């Protein structure tokens, strides 16, 4: 036993200082401390303490009021602690270690998940995915069972407006009965389930005594099953999703064998503009027995037929100097947009690496988050059966990942904090990619490893996005007309991970684009679908694990619909800032800028399911009738980009009207594009001339150095913004 004093605590703590309030770390390990040695008066002075180590002592419990509200890391391993509920006094804990406390069980782990909302690591293991599953999915299920038990057994014992005395009389019997009768999960979690059920039951009784408005929504069930495979395991058969899986272009029911070289013709829309059923085809290769792998490749480049300017020639031969480019200021953007020149044209998704492949369609691209300023700017692209990661400056394909028989439609990056074998934290960029097989593949590109797969949907995945607030929260949209929220977890040092399904959102058609609302990332998701634009409540504290849309947005263009024109197909949507959304409909000929906040404020009550979008501005775009040409935004630079069917890239610099947009001022005139980039005349290695193409998607990096456009004819075009 050691007597703790101010002097001793200052000696054991860091940084070295003269006041307890300045301590950030404190190591009291192996000091034979008992419960009575932890003086609350001393500990309450360490208001800024971030990390506390009291491991290898003889503690039977922790004091209940240490007032260490900023504590993030707590280690009390190798003690005699029997109860973890005392940890709720540390709401900001992110990491806890309590190994070798022989009285603590797996049920205590689950209790800690519920008590500590910010906990990410327990006993040196990442638990984000499992903890979120317990906090949300298990909580929902147990809440539903407790409420169902109340409804069937005890509700009739109370009058409509029961007095508190009557509620208290029934409450004691109800709590005892529900704890004894509600079962969930394996027997090893029996103690946790009883504890959790009692908490839920007490909250239910409390809500009745406070007479809130009763929620009469039906209880909806959600599937919690998800299959995970690590890279060391053979991928299971995907026969259930190979036969009849939809193609990426579900515009019209049509025989795919009669398709021309470019599968999109405006006549396809004219034939049956309201038919939204996906086309189907038999896949050439089953997912079974088709291993995925990273491969080395030298991708064919396509040369400019016209001679570039001397300035451009210098750019093509320039090498990376490692000197970071100064970010563009808003005043320089317009000037920069006048100086965008082609840099590389690559055929890196060719079948068999053939330079004659002008049929493979490219669907999505995303710039890798910058973890190191010395690293080259890299962009991930997908199309056909492969994913490429390209150095924008050199045009070199640094990594290529291929899955025979797959057709990738979407990809998205996230940055995770991984713990290495040395115990050190390091940030890694992870790429999630999905497509025809309905499987999300988790790729650590720098490690040249696809470390796992999530069997997310039985039909093809059309779109994905990560939450900007929770880096492990992944939304996947599919041709099965569902959007599912996953917690993908963080891989350990051996790349083992455990994803969890948290929420299912039902859509009325295929989701094409989707975004978490930046101003409220825990509350709403907006998606552009084949029959309109919708928003869902994604709050995980709600009862329903499966939900329909909260609201549908109407656009002025809908009033002009007729038999040969369907404007409900919203094929593009992106946030320009925290409030303004850029979106367009098929055959619209323009792009809408509309306010999320003002639109939602027009909702008079929650029973209103349709809202007129508050349009702030309209921007002229191509009169193309070709669907699924995706726009993108640069929130950092207030710019919008969109390609068209002739290979042109439309660019809108909105800095000049930024103030009006932020004030919600309506612009009555249609805004012209700031610049239109024309497709250059290209010549392949076999002297094939490419004078125009269809641009599927355009994106720029956050610092506005590179613009990347993907085409329908297997060409990745990279442009340099000077």
From Swiss-Prot:
Feature: compositional bias, Polar residues: 219-230
Gene Ontology cellular-component terms listed: centrosome; chromosome, telomeric region; cytoplasm; kinetochore; nuclear origin of replication recognition complex; nucleus; pericentric heterochromatin
Gene3D superfamilies documented for this protein: Ribonuclease Inhibitor (3.80.10.10), YVTN repeat-like/Quinoprotein amine dehydrogenase (2.130.10.10)
Classification via InterPro entries: Leu-rich_rpt, LRR_dom_sf, LRR_LRWD1_dom, LRWD1, WD40/YVTN_repeat-like_dom_sf, WD40_repeat_CS, WD40_repeat_dom_sf, WD40_rpt
Record keyword Cytoplasm present: yes
WD repeat start-end pairs: 456-496, 506-546, 565-604, 623-662, 690-722
LRR repeat placement: 22-42, 48-69, 70-91
GO terms for biological process, alphabetical: chromatin organization; DNA replication; establishment of protein localization to chromatin
Region (Disordered): 211-292
Subcellular location: Nucleus; Chromosome, Centromere; Chromosome, Telomere; Cytoplasm, Cytoskeleton, Microtubule organizing center, Centrosome
An example molecular function term from Gene Ontology annotations: chromatin binding
Keyword set, alphabetical order: Centromere, Chromatin regulator, Chromosome, Cytoplasm, Cytoskeleton, DNA replication, Kinetochore, Leucine-rich repeat, Nucleus, Repeat, Telomere, WD repeat
Subunit structure: Component of the ORC complex.
Family (UniProt): Belongs to the LRWD1 family.
The record's note on its domains: The entire WD repeat region is required for the interaction with ORC complex components, as well as for association with chromatin and for binding to histone methylation marks.
Function statement: Required for G1/S transition. Recruits and stabilizes the origin recognition complex (ORC) onto chromatin during G1 to establish pre-replication complex (preRC) and to heterochromatic sites in post-replicated cells. Binds a combination of DNA and histone methylation repressive marks on heterochromatin. Required for silencing of major satellite repeats. May be important ORC2, ORC3 and ORC4 stability.
Record's protein name: Leucine-rich repeat and WD repeat-containing protein 1
Annotated organism of origin: Xenopus laevis
Lineage: Eukaryota, Metazoa, Chordata, Craniata, Vertebrata
């Amino acid at each position: 036993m050691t007597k703790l004093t101010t002097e001793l605590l200052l000696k054991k703590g860091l940084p070295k200082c003269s006041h307890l309030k300045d301590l950030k770390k404190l190591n009291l390990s192996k000091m034979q401390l008992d419960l009575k040695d932890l003086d609350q008066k001393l500990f309450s002075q360490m208001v800024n303490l971030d990390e506390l180590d009291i491991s290898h002592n003889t503690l039977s419990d922790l004091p209940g009021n240490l007032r260490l509200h900023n504590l993030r890391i707590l280690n009390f391993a190798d003690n005699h602690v029997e109860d973890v509920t005392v940890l709720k006094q540390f709401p900001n804990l992110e990491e806890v270690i309590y190994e070798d406390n022989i009285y603590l069980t797996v049920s205590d782990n689950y209790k800690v998940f519920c008590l500590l909302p910010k906990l990410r690591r327990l006993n040196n293991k990442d638990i984000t995915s499992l903890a979120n599953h317990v906090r949300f999915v298990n909580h929902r299920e147990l809440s539903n069972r407790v409420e169902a038990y109340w409804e069937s057994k005890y509700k009739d014992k109370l009058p409509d407006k029961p007095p508190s005395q009557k509620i208290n009389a029934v409450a004691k019997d109800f709590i005892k009965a529900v704890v004894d009768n509600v079962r969930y999960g394996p027997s090893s979690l029996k103690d946790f389930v009883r504890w959790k059920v009692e908490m839920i039951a007490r909250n239910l009784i409390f809500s009745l005594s406070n007479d809130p408005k009763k929620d009469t929504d039906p209880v909806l069930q959600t599937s919690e099953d998800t299959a995970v495979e690590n890279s060391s395991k053979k991928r299971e058969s995907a026969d259930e999703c190979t036969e009849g899986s939809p193609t990426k272009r579900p515009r019209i029911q049509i025989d795919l064998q009669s398709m021309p070289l470019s599968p999109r013709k405006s006549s396809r829309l004219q034939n049956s503009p309201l038919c939204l059923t996906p086309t189907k085809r038999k896949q050439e290769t089953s997912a079974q027995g088709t291993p995925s792998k990273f491969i080395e490749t030298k991708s064919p480049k396509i040369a400019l037929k016209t001679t570039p300017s001397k300035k451009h020639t210098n750019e093509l031969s320039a090498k990376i100097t490692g000197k970071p480019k100064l970010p563009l200021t808003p005043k320089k953007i317009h000037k920069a947009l006048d100086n965008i020149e082609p840099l590389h044209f690559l055929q890196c998704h060719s079948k068999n690496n053939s330079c004659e492949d002008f049929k493979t369609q490219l669907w999505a691209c995303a710039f890798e988050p910058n973890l190191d300023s010395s690293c080259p700017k890299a962009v991930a692209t997908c199309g056909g059966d492969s994913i490429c990661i390209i150095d924008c400056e050199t045009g070199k394909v640094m990594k290529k990942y291929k899955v025979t028989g797959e057709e990738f439609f979407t990809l998205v990056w996230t940055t995770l904090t991984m713990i290495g074998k040395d115990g050190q934290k390091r940030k890694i960029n992870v790429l999630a990619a999905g497509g025809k097989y309905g499987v999300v593949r988790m790729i650590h590109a720098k490690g040249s490893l696809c470390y796992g797969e999530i069997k997310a949907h039985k039909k093809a995945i059309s779109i994905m996005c990560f939450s900007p607030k929770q880096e492990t929260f992944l939304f996947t949209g599919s041709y099965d007309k569902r959007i599912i929220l996953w917690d993908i977890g963080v891989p350990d040092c051996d790349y083992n991970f455990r994803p969890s399904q948290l929420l299912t959102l039902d859509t009325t058609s295929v989701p094409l684009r989707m975004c978490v609302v930046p101003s409220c990332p825990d509350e709403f998701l907006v998606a552009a679908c084949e029959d309109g634009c919708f928003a869902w409540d994604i709050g995980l504290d709600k009862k329903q694990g499966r939900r329909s849309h909260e609201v549908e947005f109407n656009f002025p263009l809908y009033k002009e619909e007729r038999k040969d024109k369907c404007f409900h197909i919203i094929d593009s949507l992106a946030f320009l800032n925290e409030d303004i959304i850029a979106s367009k409909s098929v055959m619209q000929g323009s792009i809408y800028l509309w306010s999320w906040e003002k639109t939602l404020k027009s909702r008079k009550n929650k029973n209103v399911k349709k809202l007129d979008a508050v349009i702030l501005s309209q921007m002229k775009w191509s009169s193309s009738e070709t669907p699924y040409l995706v726009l993108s935004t640069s929130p950092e630079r207030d710019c919008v980009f969109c390609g068209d069917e002739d290979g042109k890239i439309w660019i809108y610099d909105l800095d000049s009207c930024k103030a009006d947009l932020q004030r919600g001022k309506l612009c009555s005139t249609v805004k012209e594009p700031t610049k239109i980039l024309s497709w250059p005349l290209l010549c392949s290695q076999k002297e094939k001339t490419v004078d125009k193409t269809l641009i599927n998607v355009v994106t720029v990096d956050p610092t506005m150095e590179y613009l990347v456009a993907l085409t329908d004819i297997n060409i990745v075009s990279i442009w340099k913004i000077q």
